[in-house]
Regions:
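CheY-like receiver
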Residues: 51-121
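Extreme N-terminal starter segment of soluble prokaryotic enzymes
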Residues: 1-4
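Two-component/phosphorelay signaling modules centered on CheY-like receiver
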Residues: 6-35
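Structural motif
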Residues: 6-11, 36-38, 54-59, 82-83
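Acidic, metal-coordinating helix/loop segments flanking the phosphotransfer/catalytic sites
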Residues: 35-51
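Short acidic-hydrophobic, aromatic-tinged amphipathic segments that line or gate anion-handling sites
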Residues: 33-37, 99-101
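Short, Lys/Arg-enriched segments at the junction into DNA-binding effector domains
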Residues: 120-130
Length: 130
């Protein structure tokens, strides 16, 4: 099974989680921990290991969460979704390759997360094909 930490404001959770599930959860093996702020994210990252961290937050709170994820779980792949395209450059400087704007398509979301799934499969030598 695959475990993702999803840090997002409450009103986004349903929509974003359903997108993740429709793209990646063919076999019901995707576990998503919902975290609603950077403090909860920090607690979760100290407590558990994840295959990926997805941050979907508006404005500077997303930046704070991204910085925290990089500090606490530097090896864990990170996807940052933001309503502010100006953060793309900051993401680049933080070496976060997967930065998505709020209006990203399912294809863009898939492309951002697919390498994570692939990386996990190679390490766990699972049979999942992408």
């Amino acid at each position: 099974s695959m475990k993702i930490a999803l840090c997002t404001e409450l009103r986004n959770v349903e929509r974003f989680e359903s997108r993740l599930r429709s793209l990646f959860d063919e076999d019901g093996q995707l576990a998503i921990d919902e975290l609603w702020n950077e403090n909860q994210l920090a607690q979760a990252l100290r407590r558990s290991r994840y295959h990926a961290v997805v941050i979907a937050m508006t404005g500077a709170r997303g930046l704070e969460a991204a910085i925290q994820a990089k500090q606490l779980a530097p090896e864990t792949p990170l996807v940052w979704w933001s309503d502010d395209k100006n953060f793309a450059l900051i993401a680049y400087h933080l070496r976060i390759p997967a930065f998505l704007s709020a209006d990203c398509s399912d294809q863009e979301l898939y492309e951002a997360i697919k390498p994570i799934m692939k990386w996990r499969c190679e390490n766990a030598n699972c049979a999942m094909q992408l």
